[in-house]
Amino acid sequence: MLSRGRLLPIAFAAGIVASVAGIGTLLASDHQDTPETELNPRMDINDVYAFPGSSADRIALVMTTSSPIVGTNIASFDPNLLYQIKIDNGGDANEDLVFQITFNTGQLTAQRVRVVGPVAPTIPGTQNVLVNTNAAVEGPVGTNLGSDTGIQVFAGPRADPFFIDLEQFFNILPDRRPSTGALSGPSTSTASAFRNPGVDLLRPFNALAIVIELPKSQLLASTSPDAKIGVWGTISR
C-alpha cells in the first residue's frame, strides 16, 4: 500500500502514519515516480520509516534516498536540496513539527550534516522555508552523532536489501516511457519470465539514509497512550 504526502513545488514526498504506543503498519514510497526524480536521482525518496527506538520511550525516524547512485563516485547528499521529515501530531494531515536536514558541498566522505528540529515550521504546507534556529545536531556524515537533548543522528550509506532482478522485470513489463527524449525506452516486452538462476541485480547498491532517534515526548501533543503521529518526508529545492 502506498501513502503519499502532498506533492510540493519541485519537491517529492513519502510518508506513514504511526502509533507511538506501538508502531502500526508501515507504508512506503515508490521509486523514480516522475521524470524529475529520474533525471535528478538525489531527489528520489526511497522510503520513510518510523521504528521503535533503542528504549520504550524513544522513536527512530528514517528516510532513505538516492539508491541508484550509491556506490558510484557521484553518490552524496545534495547541498542544494532541503531534506525534511515532517510530523503531524494533531491528526489534520498538516505538519506541526519538522526536522530540516541540510548538507555542505563535497564528496560523501567529507560532507557534514546539519539537523534543525523538531521545531514548528515557518510556513506549513506546500512552502519550504528554512527555520531560523540553531542546529539540534551537526557533524560529519557517516558518524553517530548525539546531543544533550536526547536526539541522535546518523546520515550516510546503509544497506537496504531489495531482492529483485530489476533488469529482467522491465524486460517482462516495460516501464512507461516516452518514445523520444532523455528518458525514452522500449515499450514492448522482450522476455516472459525471470532468469534461472535468479540475479540479485541490486545487491551492489546501498541507499543514503538519514536516521533520527529521539524521545517520543518531543513529538507528541499529549501524554495519552493512544496518541498518534503522522510522519512523512520531502526533498525540495
Give the label of every model feature segment.
Residues 3-4, 23, 141:
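Terminal low-complexity, poorly structured segments
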Residues 10-21:
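Bacterial N-terminal signal peptides
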Residues 26-237:
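Surface-exposed extracytoplasmic segments
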Residues 1-12:
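Bacterial N-terminal signal peptides that target proteins for export
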